[in-house]
Amino acid sequence: MSFPLWLWLALGGAVGAVCRQAAVLLLAPLVARTGFPAAVLLINVLGSFLLGLTLALTGRGVWPEAVRMTFGTGVLGAFTTFSTFSTELDGLLLRGQGGLALAYAALSVGLGLTAAVAGRVLGARL
């Protein structure tokens, strides 16, 4: 008897949420020392790379569609976080750190897009 796809999706979401929290805790000293939201930046960039790779490999049929749902939507959907990025950006602006907010936004979008493209390119070659 196989698990229904929705159950794999839910399990993937649980794994992604736990991994994100572990990464946040691991990087908490860096964030506290610098005041820069490095944890969410790194989480989102890594997630962008892994999603680009996953979509390339499932799109080519190397991995089954269930992997896209379980890993792409479940794990990576829970691991990455646009809402936390947005609220951290807002917090920087509220504290009068406009330059840091601009750097955070530019790095998040620029590195995230670069990582997604790199994942897609790697997936096309595997």
UniProtKB/Swiss-Prot annotation:
GO terms for cellular component: plasma membrane. Na(+) is not transported, but it plays an essential structural role and its presence is essential for fluoride channel function. It catalyses: fluoride(in) = fluoride(out). The chain crosses the membrane at residues 7-27, 36-56, 74-94, 98-118. It comes from the Bacteria. GO terms for molecular function: fluoride channel activity; fluoride transmembrane transporter activity; metal ion binding. Keywords: Cell membrane, Ion channel, Ion transport, Membrane, Metal-binding, Sodium, Transmembrane, Transmembrane helix, Transport. Pfam families: CRCB. GO terms for biological process: cellular detoxification of fluoride; fluoride transmembrane transport. It is a multi-pass membrane protein. It is found in: Cell membrane. Its main location: membrane. The keyword Amino-acid biosynthesis does not apply. The keyword Nucleotide-binding does not apply. Fluoride-specific ion channel. Important for reducing fluoride concentration in the cell, thus reducing its toxicity. HAMAP family: FluC. Belongs to the fluoride channel Fluc/FEX (TC 1.A.43) family. This is Fluoride-specific ion channel FluC. It comes from Deinococcus radiodurans (strain ATCC 13939 / DSM 20539 / JCM 16871 / CCUG 27074 / LMG 4051 / NBRC 15346 / NCIMB 9279 / VKM B-1422 / R1).
